[in-house]
Amino acid sequence: MSHSVLKVPPSVIERMQSHYGPDITSLSVQGAVFQAKPQGCTITAYRSGKVLFQGKNAEKEAERWTADAETPAPKKPASKKSIPSVYQPPEGIGSMSVIGSDEVGTGDYFGPITVACVYADKAKLPLLKELGVKDSKNLKDPQIVQIARDLIKTVPYSLLVLRNEKYNEMQEKGMSQGKMKALLHNQAIGNLLKKLDGTRPEAILIDQFAEPAVYFKHLAGKTAVKERTYFSTKAEGIHLSVAAASIIARYSFLMEMDKLSKQAGITLPKGAGPLVDEAGAKLIKKHGEDALRVFTKLHFANTQKAKRIASKR
């Protein structure tokens, strides 16, 4: 069985816990902060900072985090790239006119999924840099708010918000989160292309969350935007359009979380860690278990943890 080990700081453990929220198991592993089981991989993050990736997709999942690692995983021997060449971003894409697409909220127990896409004309790339557009992971919330407010006045964009009640309804009907994301990205891109009214981007770049074949399989029966569409992990570092899309999506998520916190009467934390379990328990005590449907992604393991905490109070 393939495996990789990374050593990462606590801040990255928190980000990983948020990222893998839907896949976190309720199993208790000695010394572990969490264990998650995304497709083809078991990930165990320990309090020591070590993160163990096991399974056929171990190397692929570890690669997402190597840039953040204190001791990167050893280089693997050269092999065929997992993305078919037709979907790999072309050379020089960073200076092209591109639609970039990204999502936020998939690993957060509270709040919606927000998907944004941005058309960044190559003539506007210097302006985007001046506005402070870069990888949103390196920006704090106040910076996100300021830059996003400038962006929405500057670039053509499309934004979709999948709120919790609709999310839970779709999930209970058997739809995976991966399919939801594919549908949202495709719809947002289609909406933006209509806004552009004939202007053709040189490329469409999606921050990769699934293999291209799986992404398009999710869109079976829909009008899929496929021409000049490319996929890459860490796409925010490849083209500013994706970085801008991520900022707008995160801004929207923050605004939605503020609204939900006011509605709940308590501050709802981001992520899927212990603070979230505590907030979930407070929500249950204040509004009853039915309120979880409005505020949370019910299938996360946090639901049962919050119920257990609430039952003891």
Swiss-Prot record:
Residues 96-312 form the RNase H type-2 domain. GO terms for cellular component: cytoplasm; ribonuclease H2 complex. Residues 62-88 are annotated as: Disordered. Its EC number is 3.1.26.4. A divalent metal cation binds at residues 102-103, 207. GO terms for molecular function: magnesium ion binding; RNA binding; RNA-DNA hybrid ribonuclease activity. Keywords: Cytoplasm, Endonuclease, Hydrolase, Magnesium, Metal-binding, Nuclease. It catalyses: Endonucleolytic cleavage to 5'-phosphomonoester. Manganese or magnesium. Binds 1 divalent metal ion per monomer in the absence of substrate. May bind a second metal ion after substrate binding. Its cofactor is Mn(2+); Mg(2+). GO terms for biological process: DNA replication, removal of RNA primer; mismatch repair. It is found in: Cytoplasm. Endonuclease that specifically degrades the RNA of RNA-DNA hybrids. HAMAP family: RNase_HIII (MF_00053). Belongs to the RNase HII family. RnhC subfamily. NCBIfam families: rnhC. This is Ribonuclease HIII. It comes from Bacillus licheniformis (strain ATCC 14580 / DSM 13 / JCM 2505 / CCUG 7422 / NBRC 12200 / NCIMB 9375 / NCTC 10341 / NRRL NRS-1264 / Gibson 46).
